[in-house]
Amino acid sequence: MTQTPDREKALELAVAQIEKSYGKGSVMRLGDEARQPISVIPTGSIALDVALGIGGLPRGRVIEIYGPESSGKTTVALHAVANAQAAGGVAAFIDAEHALDPDYAKKLGVDTDSLLVSQPDTGEQALEIADMLIRSGALDIVVIDSVAALVPRAELEGEMGDSHVGLQARLMSQALRKMTGALNNSGTTAIFINQLRDKIGVMFGSPETTTGGKALKFYASVRMDVRRVETLKDGTNAVGNRTRVKVVKNKCLAEGTRIFDPVTGTTHRIEDVVDGRKPIHVVAAAKDGTLHARPVVSWFDQGTRDVIGLRIAGGAIVWATPDHKVLTEYGWRAAGELRKGDRVAQPRRFDGFGDSAPIPADHARLLGYLIGDGRDGWVGGKTPINFINVQRALIDDVTRIAATLGCAAHPQGRISLAIAHRPGERNGVADLCQQAGIYGKLAWEKTIPNWFFEPDIAADIVGNLLFGLFESDGWVSREQTGALRVGYTTTSEQLAHQIHWLLLRFGVGSTVRDYDPTQKRPSIVNGRRIQSKRQVFEVRISGMDNVTAFAESVPMWGPRGAALIQAIPEATQGRRRGSQATYLAAEMTDAVLNYLDERGVTAQEAAAMIGVASGDPRGGMKQVLGASRLRRDRVQALADALDDKFLHDMLAEELRYSVIREVLPTRRARTFDLEVEELHTLVAEGVVVHNCSPPFKQAEFDILYGKGISREGSLIDMGVDQGLIRKSGAWFTYEGEQLGQGKENARNFLVENADVADEIEKKIKEKLGIGAVVTDDPSNDGVLPAPVDF
């Protein structure tokens, strides 16, 4: 809506008043000026510059470098100082450890004559000096070495053994609050070198932690974990170290986020996992869209932060920091960028089956009955196990199975069955319940034993368990559209999520939501009213593709199964809306259509191969395979007819894409990080997200004794990785010119031929798109630099 002249004038007056009070540029329209690339300070290693993503350390930001002793932390910081000075900048070094070696710094390229050095007496003095230098606006980079040496004045003036709990953490928090604004305004980069300490009593995971509290983790735009990997040798002489730097950033999930462990079948809340440092497994997504179980290897409590909520179709809500990456049908996007109507990735299928049978199928079915409608005896076995159900077919089935386990079933009225062992025989039903962990448990405490989540369990074992559950507390209903729904209702939250994940093994999609027992379902085909004073959870299967898959996967001879089978033919007549699992990701549409065009497959040919399920070929190939998105069943039929590997690879993706119904307002919450081994993703609240610590980018380079980071060695490593330098045996070759035999000789060649080294560096940066040059008029080519996420 266009603003009226009076409102525009009022806004101009307000902006003028703000600029008068706080300076020009305090308020601006984002479209008034072109966005400039982030200015950076090179680190001296092209590999590390690439890992940072923008060609170096960002100016105007806080950087934390931490790691074990003698790992190369100070060397990395001094190289940044040398590069800042080489560009004409001014550098300062706050030597709180009183351990700076001027000769070593000079060998790394630092201009020690112009370097500002301070060796403060207390932590307050060090941070105050740094703050004053930053606020001068004349400084390009300042290094504080180290956080552990920033000892508060009160501790220095006290006696040995005095306790000063949290004093240094409060000092760091206050200093960073003051400094961050000044750093941004002056464009100064502040590097804090930090040390590692070990937490006492840690049983699982790494006990390592950094000093100075948690404030630095939050204020740091970039955190770098420096580790020495191996010793470099020239013959038998050690000449340096191979160093690995992991670039760490903080993106987090909020407390309350539920994470499923596919190994134990247990759903955990993320705060319980982190606080207890539980060595759980999670479901993680690979780049090809397949799902795998992977262990959690690190746990991080990231404090209280702003989080936003994404309400997904089906009821799931994910709360995450706005910069946390979520997998969408167009790739990874920050949670804060997502809007209502966008689609996010959820599991479509997971794990599959083998041929293992930990218990017979009849026993699995009995467990399903007893989890749903059983009231198990108390420990001691004197109280019989009761099965309460009105269906005669189920009562007869329980009676028959109990007889094979040394038990007799005695009717207790019309709907109850008491199961007790026969004289002289062992109570096999009680043994089965105890083995499964449900003996003596109340309804809301019951769960499915972890054997059912073994990767090689047979499908009929799981199918019979689900049969027993479905026939006890399940239901079938009809929507207003005529489509069917199937579900299961329970007071056990763990049980509801376990059923959801077992259904995914059959490729049956479902949702878990809170259920209000006072609500009336649209039209019950077969089921019963739920009455409970406790919280109730519902597993709901929607979409005729999922309902049909459920009917094909689980035995259907019971009363509810028979009702479902009878209702399916009518429900599948005409056009019925399927679930989101029916469709491929929108990102795949062009790839599939272009491939078929290149292969020479016409719309008419594709329609003939697909058959009656095909779309109208007069609308082209896209209409044949779907409409706005391609239908999985049609692409599957075409892939089978063509026996085409490319199409089968596309269909191997185990994800579906569900729409975001609502973006919830920001709130404050505790947030947590996990590090997931290898794949660096996980399924949280049923949505695929980056593991809270996103895939760490790593860089490896050589630090030579007395020389520092080997720029030339890093260029050789990156050149080989990017295909610019060819390695054949021990020889390194660049554009037909031999650099030398062995890395040391190739390194010496680049030292002596700086123009070749510069050319290789330029080509690496151009290929990877880093190291943008700031121009006077960035709009000359009509393209603005991409924003950089820190």
UniProtKB/Swiss-Prot annotation:
PROSITE patterns named among the record's database cross-references: INTEIN_C_TER, INTEIN_ENDONUCLEASE, INTEIN_N_TER, RECA_1, RECA_2, RECA_3
Major location category of this protein: cytoplasm
Residues given in the record as ATP binding sites: 67-74
Record-linked PANTHER family: MITOCHONDRIAL DNA REPAIR PROTEIN RECA HOMOLOG-RELATED, RECA
Cross-link (Isoglutamyl lysine isopeptide (Lys-Gln) (interchain with Q-Cter in protein Pup)): 762
Family: Belongs to the RecA family.
Domain of life: Bacteria
Subcellular compartments: Cytoplasm
PTM notes: This protein undergoes a protein self splicing that involves a post-translational excision of the intervening region (intein) followed by peptide ligation.
Keywords recorded for this protein, A-Z: ATP-binding, Autocatalytic cleavage, Cytoplasm, DNA damage, DNA recombination, DNA repair, DNA-binding, Endonuclease, Hydrolase, Intron homing, Isopeptide bond, Nuclease, Nucleotide-binding, Protein splicing, SOS response, Ubl conjugation
GO cellular component: cytosol
Induction: By DNA damage, and by ADP-ribosylation catalyzed by DarT (at protein level).
One annotated GO molecular function: magnesium ion binding
Enzyme class: hydrolase
EC number(s) reported in the record: 3.1.-.-
Protein name as catalogued: Protein RecA
InterPro entries registered for this protein in UniProt: AAA+_ATPase, DNA_recomb/repair_RecA, DNA_recomb/repair_RecA_CS, Hint_dom_C, Hint_dom_N, Hint_dom_sf, Homing_endonucl, INTEIN
Functional summary from the UniProt entry: Can catalyze the hydrolysis of ATP in the presence of single-stranded DNA, the ATP-dependent uptake of single-stranded DNA by duplex DNA, and the ATP-dependent hybridization of homologous single-stranded DNAs. It interacts with LexA causing its activation and leading to its autocatalytic cleavage.
Subunit structure: Interacts with UvrD1 and UvrA. Co-immunoprecipitates with DarG in the presence and absence of darT.
GO BP term (any one): intron homing
Pfam families: Intein_splicing (PF14890), LAGLIDADG_3 (PF14528), RecA (PF00154), RecA_C (PF21096)
Domain DOD-type homing endonuclease: 366-508
CDD domains (alphabetical): Hint, RecA
